[in-house]
Amino acid sequence: MPRSLKKGPFVDDHLLKKVDAQNERKDKRVIKTWSRRSTIVPEMIGHTIAVHNGKQHVPVFVNEQMIGHKLGEFSPTRSYRGHGADKNAKGSKKK
């Protein structure tokens, strides 16, 4: 269910303060955050935000196409390595 337009996008205050401070200083350092739920807003364009995935911070460079999406969408939490190989298919067949 989408968020109501009258409420506007949700961005954690501490994250928005860090982005605004870097915009004022014209600084482009990496911003670490655990806020995967924050929506990407136009003020974040050009910044690299390191989003926590539960184990480490994944750097995400924000561009125009990402506006309106959540930060967590660009930092996967699960790694799929494929299903296990069938032990019988490799060598001998059953008789």
UniProtKB/Swiss-Prot annotation:
Residues 73-95 are annotated as: Disordered. The keyword rRNA-binding applies. One of its GO terms (cellular component) is cytoplasm. Keywords: Ribonucleoprotein, Ribosomal protein, RNA-binding, rRNA-binding. GO terms for biological process: ribosomal small subunit assembly; translation. The keyword Mitochondrion does not apply. InterPro entries: Ribosomal_uS19 (IPR002222), Ribosomal_uS19_bac-type (IPR005732), Ribosomal_uS19_CS (IPR020934), Ribosomal_uS19_SF (IPR023575). Pfam families: Ribosomal_S19 (PF00203). One of its GO terms (molecular function) is structural constituent of ribosome. PANTHER family: RIBOSOMAL PROTEIN S19P FAMILY MEMBER, SMALL RIBOSOMAL SUBUNIT PROTEIN US19M. Belongs to the universal ribosomal protein uS19 family. Protein S19 forms a complex with S13 that binds strongly to the 16S ribosomal RNA. This is Small ribosomal subunit protein uS19. The lineage of its organism: Bacteria, Thermotogati, Deinococcota, Deinococci, Deinococcales.
